[in-house]
Amino acid sequence: MQYLHDQPDVDNTDVLLIFGWNGMQSHQIPQAPRKLQRLSKDKDKMLIVVDPRKTETAKLADIHLPIRPGTDALLLKAMISLILKEGWENKEYLADHTSGFDSVKSCFENFDARAAVKTCNLDFDQVREVTRLYATRKSSLRYDLGLFMGRHSGLNS
């Protein structure tokens, strides 16, 4: 039953963005340590970890964002805001597979991503680069308990 929920396609992703999951210790993906090590050694792929702790997985990462605990939702909003501001969203996909996107987009128009990232105790330029990589390359997302244990866990999920 453990593997019946969505899993990132670690084998076929160029960028794996992880929020609050230490895959080297918490094996909720079959063969997680082996897959994470292989991904981290591949020069054409990126492992990005968002976690306040320098976990075993964060030590493997190409980029580790040591976020201030409890600010994950704020970081995600900043990232969405940057994607929309820079035009990195997949417009064709959104047109073909969504409805009402303009009403969602309007929620981010006046959002101050720089101030949000500062509240997260992260470097704006580094977050902008992580966001660009995630938005413009073949990417997957993995999140786990670390994301769900904060003050805004319902919003995060």
Feature-to-residue mapping (PLM):
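Cofactor-pocket helix-loop regions in the catalytic cores of large enzyme subunits
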Residues: 1-157
